[in-house]
């Protein structure tokens, strides 16, 4: 019988500074922590933490997702992050606060929400 190839072990990178990308939409919040060059180290979202449906859009779900991503990044030796926030969702501030509470030092907070120069037609207004 042929020998099975060994599974590659996940190597521990030792990265001290990085970038936390927070994408907060009306339905979900996704947090990706990368190194300065843009290679992802850890990521989490409100869905992966265990929330479904409309609960994903809450600030509490964003808080738990950010804590999980921060814990994974700190295992790789990360101490300081620059935060890039994108989108209009409810989890923006909660995610930033929980990154700080997890023990990561926030050096910069920047809003990188894309603003159209009158591009696509927006969704129609809701009539409730």
Swiss-Prot record:
A Pfam family reported for this protein in Swiss-Prot or TrEMBL? Ribosomal_S11
Residues in coiled coil: none
Q: Name one GO molecular function term.
A: rRNA binding
InterPro entries found in the cross-reference section: Ribosomal_uS11, Ribosomal_uS11_bac-type, Ribosomal_uS11_CS, Ribosomal_uS11_sf
**Gene3D superfamilies under this entry?**
Ribosomal protein S11 (3.30.420.80)
For this entry, list what GO says about its biological process: translation
Annotated SUPFAM superfamilies = Translational machinery components
Q: Which domain of life is it from?
A: Bacteria
| Record keywords, A-Z | Ribonucleoprotein, Ribosomal protein, RNA-binding, rRNA-binding
Q: Write out the transmembrane intervals.
A: none
Q: Which GO terms describe its cellular component?
A: ribonucleoprotein complex; ribosome
Q: What NCBIfam families does the annotation carry? A: PRK05309.1, uS11_bact
Q: What does this protein do?
A: Located on the platform of the 30S subunit, it bridges several disparate RNA helices of the 16S rRNA. Forms part of the Shine-Dalgarno cleft in the 70S ribosome.
**Subunit note:** Part of the 30S ribosomal subunit. Interacts with proteins S7 and S18. Binds to IF-3.
The family database entries (HAMAP family) matched by this protein are listed as: Ribosomal_uS11
The record's family statement is: Belongs to the universal ribosomal protein uS11 family.
What name appears for this protein in its UniProt entry? Small ribosomal subunit protein uS11
Species this chain originates from: Desulforudis audaxviator (strain MP104C)
The encoding gene is rpsK
